[in-house]
Structure formats: C-alpha cells, structure tokens
C-alpha cells in the first residue's frame, strides 16, 4: 500500500483569539475520527493555527482503503433447499441480491447449524475522493456558537473564508469546502512577505509559509518564541514577566509573526495599586507586566507586535501613548475613591438591589456581618474583626475603580481598607471573601478571611434556595454550585469544627421572613451532599467509597473528609473485600428482622465457639474504638475492625444465625447488629465493591 502526507488549510479573516486553539484541536479530532470511520490508516496527525488560518497535517496517510472481504450470511440450509434439494425462493432471492447464483454460494458451518455464505470482495476507495467530504463534515462539527455569512454565499462559518488548500503530497485534492474550491494558493502575512504563493507539496507547508509568507503557522513554536522573547526582555531590565498562560495563549492567537518589544510608563502610576495597573495592561492591552525580584511592579511592560519594523522605537512609542490614558484613568479613579471611606459608602448600598426578595446590598452585608461573627465564635476567630469585615465586604462595589474594573472587587476593598486604617485581618478578608473563585484556586486560611468567605457564600446559597430558585439542569445564574464547593473546601482544608446544619439554620434565621420555601434547609443540605460527591469524584475517589460515607450523611465537612480518607485506606487493605461482603450479608439479615432488634448480647446464650470468639473480640475492641470514633480517627478505628475478618468468616461458616431456638437467634442477631454498628460509626462498608 502507498502512503502520502496530507495538508488541509482553511484561510480566513482573523479568527477569535480565545477560540483559536479549541477550533484547531476540534478540527483535527473530527478529521481523524473521519479517517478511522473510513478505515484509512495514517501514522500521525497534527494541527496548526494562526490568526487567519486553520490547518491539519496527516502523516503517512494511506492512498486508498484496504481491500476487504465481507461475509454475507444467507438462509439456513434447511430453509435454502426443499426436500428434493432444489433452491427455495428465499435462497434464490438472497443469491440474486448478492449478484450470484445459489450454486456459487459457499457454506458456513458452526456448532449451531449451517448457512449459505457469500464472501464478497470490496475494493478500497481512493483516499483523494473521500477527503473533501470528510473535511467538510469535520468543519461542520466545529464548536461555533454564532456562525456568520459573507458576500452572496449561503455558506456559514466563524469568519469569512478566502482560500482552501488540500494537498495529498504534491497533488491538489479536488473538492470544495465552505464555498471555496481547493487550490495551491496560500496567503501570507498581511504586511510582510508574499501576499500569496503556490504551495508545491504538503510537506513544505510550514517552511514555505515561514520563508515566503512571513507566517509562523506552528502554534506551539509561536507560543514558545513569545515566551522566550518575553522572558529575555524582562531579564534584560532586571525583572520577571508575568506570563499567565491564558494571556500567553491569547497573544499567540493574535499574531502570525511575533516580535517582542519592551516599553515603559511613568513611575508616578506605581502609586496606584498594582492590581489595577496589571488589570489594565493585561485585560485591555494584552501586555505582559514586569515585576522586580521582590515582586514589585516595575514601570515597564512587554508587548508583542505582528510586524518587523525598521524603526521599532516608533511602535514602542505608539503603545506607550495608548496605555497612558488607561493608566491615568486608573490613577484618577483611585485618587477620587480615597476621598471617601468604605464605611461612608454603606448608605449608598441601600440603592443597589441584591435580589428582589432578599433585599438590598446593605441588607446583605448586615447578614454577612452577623454570620461572620457567628462563625468566628465557633472557630475561635476574632468575632469583632469578622463582623467588621462582613459589614464592609461590599462597600468597594460603590467605588469608581470597581465600577470601571469589576474584576477588582474585593481587591480594591483591601487597599481602601488599609488606607482607612482598618486592621490587616479585616483588609485581607475583603480581598479573600470571594475565594476560591475557580477550580484549583486556593482557599482563605486567615481566620477572619475564612469567616467572611463562608458567610458570603452561605448568605447567597441559603437565600436563593429559600426563595425557590435552586439551580436547574446546567443553569446556575447565582453560581450556587461553586459557592457550595467553596464552603466545603474552606471547611475541609482548614479542618474547621463546623456543622452544615448549624450554618444553614443561622443563615435562615438571618434572612428571616424573606424566605418563602419551607423546605430550604433540607434542600440546601441535600445540595451539599451532591456537591460532596461531585468534588470527591473529581479528585479520583472511588464512587463506592463516596456512597459508603454518604450513607451515614455526615454534616460536618471536615468529618466527612476524615471518613472518605479512612474508607479509601480501608478499601486498600487485604481484609476489606471479605469484610465488605460480610457487612452486606449482615445488612441483608438484619433488614429481614421484623420488629426491634435485641438490645444487648447475652454471654450465657453464646453456644458455638465461633460466636464466643467474635463476641469476645468485639468486647475487647469496643473500649479502644470508642475514643477513636469520638476523635474522628476513623482510619485507625477501621484498621482495628479489619482484624475481625477471620472471626467474622469463621462465624458465618460455623454458626446458623436464624436458629430454631428464638433466644439463640435473637442473641446472634444482637451480635451481628453490634458488629455492624461499629462499622457504621465510620461508613456503610457493605456498599464497597
């Protein structure tokens, strides 16, 4: 079989930078799926992407499908011939449908019988005749939320398409994609190199674009060039560039020929909180800020231009002119905001509605303040500072800086609190109240910050459930799932002695008559249980371990976590499988008992040696287990219980639980109930697989 390399490039107008990687990866994934469905072999495949192009390269693609033999089974021999041995209508119809006579058919013999069989040879189709249709289907499946039309075309795509190039080796693959016929034409850089050129061979794609078109189409190479260039530029001025990957990806998707340059801004702007300056540089201008070795922002920034200039200083000066008004705005907002304290802004919070049924933002901060103080008393934090931080938690929403740069809420509150003379604990809590903001974000650990972060999330969660607006399906407009996970993570990662039932009840109390859903507490608790499951599954914890703990419905997050870790460890023990099976057996036996189970074990009714041994071992373990369970040391407790495996196995081998003698039976049920009760202190081990 012969092989060739394939190139497919779609040349477009500028593609959305934040979608470029996803589009390219999806194009490649869709196309390789098509190749596999068509049974076309290939060695490897890669994607390339730049602002005005999506491309895939397939290495060593088979030039045709392999020939194959398809077996088509006909009627059973008993139905294929009559008693005289002549073909039946069924046999002749089947043969005719396959283009043969009955006499030409073979036979298929199995242990289940014998059938007519036709082995048809299917000649493989040439690859070049399949490519265009496969490519079109691949493009049709791209994740494009809002496709557009252009010109007089009825074709839709994410951006107007100007060229399509499909080359199988040096041969142009005939066909049409997105309204454009395939040709050799490749467009180069808008302002450098050749505007367009003919590509001779698929293998030359990257090199020809680079040499003739002044385009680096290899996305990862382009990204690496930008990263290395920015690092070198920052080091040259004694700093370190902030190369956050999301911004690095976006900049990579904005340029075809990256040139890294360094610019400056006036040092006076450094009096403005660094976060505001960084937000402006990164968010608005796509610049990389530079920090010194002490972590302080420097009056410099690094940017990437899409052109090589004979006078780069002119480009630098232009970017400095562009960023200056933005920094000046931030400076003005900051200086203006400083004239009023956070406390003085509380009155203005009355004008902002949090939620129609839940009141204003001022009502909300009053609840957060009370809730933070309540939590502080429960975890030995400073209740006055927690209440103060809760009261001021939303005041920065009324500042010019946050109104202009909404992502700085909390952060600007921290800076203004420091300027107002608030304690550092209060100031830090204002910044950390929203943490964790996303999966993988850190949780607050400072006691006052913990109190406010929990209070802020609980107020939202209980309030929204309390007015009957729980999340439905994928819709979650108040981000309640994130809030619930945040609460659980803060409690677990700080090992806080808090109970969800108490927290929910206090939040309900603070909302008062605002809440109309009388089942809110129950629903919120159930919501937390669901979040527990989702969170631990994301961490790779086995579902059966999670279900074993959920069966006990622990309402303290830290306690829940201790049980998860203990059961995960227990599950890895040699004895776990047998004890899980035994627990399941015990559970089934006890479930069939009518009425109440016997309360205590009567030693005088222990007849068989196996039941005496099990009862004795249980009796010996209980004084050791009680303090372990009381201290939530479930791992050590389950390790002790694991030692019962042999005694439990022997009990079930030698003892008839449901004895005819009622007294013996009840005593044995009491023994099994006592055994199961010890395991249930940690989890329902019977659910382990």
From Swiss-Prot:
Q: Name one Pfam family in it.
A: DALR_1
What this protein catalyses is:
tRNA(Gly) + glycine + ATP = glycyl-tRNA(Gly) + AMP + diphosphate
One example of the protein's molecular function in GO is: ATP binding
The protein's matches in SUPFAM superfamilies, at most eight in alphabetical order, are given as: HD-domain/PDEase-like
Q: Which residues form the signal peptide?
A: none
PROSITE patterns this protein is in? AA_TRNA_LIGASE_II_GLYAB
Q: Which UniProt keywords apply?
A: Aminoacyl-tRNA synthetase, ATP-binding, Cytoplasm, Ligase, Nucleotide-binding, Protein biosynthesis
For this record, an example GO cellular component is: cytosol
Q: Which family does it belong to?
A: Belongs to the class-II aminoacyl-tRNA synthetase family.
Annotated protein name in UniProt: Glycine--tRNA ligase beta subunit
EC number from the UniProt entry: 6.1.1.14
What's the subunit arrangement here?
Answer: Tetramer of two alpha and two beta subunits.
Q: Which organism is it from?
A: Shewanella sediminis (strain HAW-EB3)
Q: Where found, per UniProt?
A: Cytoplasm
One example of a Gene Ontology biological process annotation: glycyl-tRNA aminoacylation
């Amino acid at each position: 079989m012969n092989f060739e390399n394939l190139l497919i490039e779609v040349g477009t107008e500028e593609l959305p930078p934040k979608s470029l990687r996803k589009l390219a990866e999806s194009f490649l994934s869709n196309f390789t799926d098509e190749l596999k469905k068509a049974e076309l072999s290939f060695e490897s495949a890669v994607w390339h992407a730049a602002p005005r192009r999506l491309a895939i390269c397939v290495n060593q693609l088979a030039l045709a499908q392999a020939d194959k033999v398809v077996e088509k089974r006909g009627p059973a021999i008993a139905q294929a011939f009559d008693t005289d041995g002549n073909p039946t209508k069924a046999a002749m119809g089947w043969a005719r449908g396959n283009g043969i006579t009955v006499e030409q058919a073979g036979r298929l013999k199995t242990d289940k019988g014998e059938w007519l069989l036709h082995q048809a040879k299917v000649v493989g189709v040439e690859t070049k005749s399949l490519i265009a249709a496969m490519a079109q289907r691949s493009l049709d499946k791209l994740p494009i939320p809002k496709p557009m039309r252009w010109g007089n075309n009825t074709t839709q795509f994410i951006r107007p398409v100007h060229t399509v190039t499909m080359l199988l080796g040096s041969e142009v693959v005939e066909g049409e994609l997105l309204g454009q016929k395939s040709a050799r034409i490749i467009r180069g850089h808008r302002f450098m190199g050749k505007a367009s050129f003919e590509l001779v061979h698929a293998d030359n794609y990257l090199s020809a674009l680079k040499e003739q078109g002044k385009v680096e189409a290899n996305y990862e190479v382009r990204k690496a060039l930008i990263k290395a260039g920015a690092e070198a530029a920052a080091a040259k001025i004694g700093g370190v560039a902030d190369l956050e990957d999301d911004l690095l990806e976006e900049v990579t998707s904005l340029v075809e020929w990256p040139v890294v340059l360094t610019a400056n801004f006036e040092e006076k702007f450094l009096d403005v909180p660094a976060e505001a300056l960084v937000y402006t540089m990164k968010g608005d201008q796509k610049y990389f800020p530079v920090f010194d070795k002490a972590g302080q922002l420097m009056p410099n920034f690094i940017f990437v231009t899409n052109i090589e200039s004979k006078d780069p200083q002119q480009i630098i000066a232009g970017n400095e002119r562009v960023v200056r008004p933005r920094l000046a705005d931030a400076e003005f907002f900051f200086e203006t905001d400083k004239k009023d304290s956070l406390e003085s802004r509380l009155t203005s919070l009355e004008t902002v509605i949090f939620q129609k049924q839940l009141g204003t933002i001022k009502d909300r901060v009053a609840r957060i303040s009370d809730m933070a103080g309540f939590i502080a008393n429960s975890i030995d934090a400073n209740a006055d500072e927690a209440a103060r931080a809760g009261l001021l938690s939303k005041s920065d929403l009324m500042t010019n800086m946050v109104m202009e740069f909404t992502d700085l809420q909390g952060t600007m509150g921290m800076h203004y609190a420091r300027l107002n003379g608030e304690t550092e604990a209060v100031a830090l809590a204002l910044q950390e109240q929203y943490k964790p903001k996303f999966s993988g974000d850190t949780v607050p650990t400072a006691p006052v910050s913990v109190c406010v972060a929990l209070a802020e999330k609980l107020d939202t969660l209980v309030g929204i459930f309390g007015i009957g607006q729980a999340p439905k399906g994928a819709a979650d407009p108040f981000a309640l799932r994130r809030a619930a996970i945040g609460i659980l993570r803060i409690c677990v990662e700080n090992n806080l002695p808090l109970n969800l039932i108490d927290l929910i009840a206090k939040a309900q109390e603070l909302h008062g008559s605002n809440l109309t859903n009388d089942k809110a507490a129950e629903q919120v608790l159930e919501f937390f249980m669901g979040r527990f499951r989702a969170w631990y599954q994301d961490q790779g914890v086995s579902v059966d371990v999670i279900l074993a703990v959920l069966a006990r419905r622990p309402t303290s997050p830290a306690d829940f976590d201790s049980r998860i870790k203990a059961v995960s460890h227990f599950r890895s023990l040699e004895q776990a499988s047998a004890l899980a099976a035994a627990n399941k057996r015990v559970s089934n036996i006890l479930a069939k008992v009518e009425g109440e189970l016997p309360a205590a074990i009567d030693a005088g009714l222990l007849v068989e040696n196996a039941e005496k041994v099990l009862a004795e071992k249980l009796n010996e373990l209980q004084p050791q287990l009680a303090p372990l369970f009381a201290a939530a040391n479930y791992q050590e407790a389950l390790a002790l219980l694991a030692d019962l495996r042999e005694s439990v196995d022997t009990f079930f081998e030698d003892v008839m639980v449901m004895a005819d003698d009622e007294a013996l039976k009840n005593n044995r049920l009491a023994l099994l109930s006592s055994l199961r009760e010890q395991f249930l202190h940690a989890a329902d081990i019977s659910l382990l697989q």
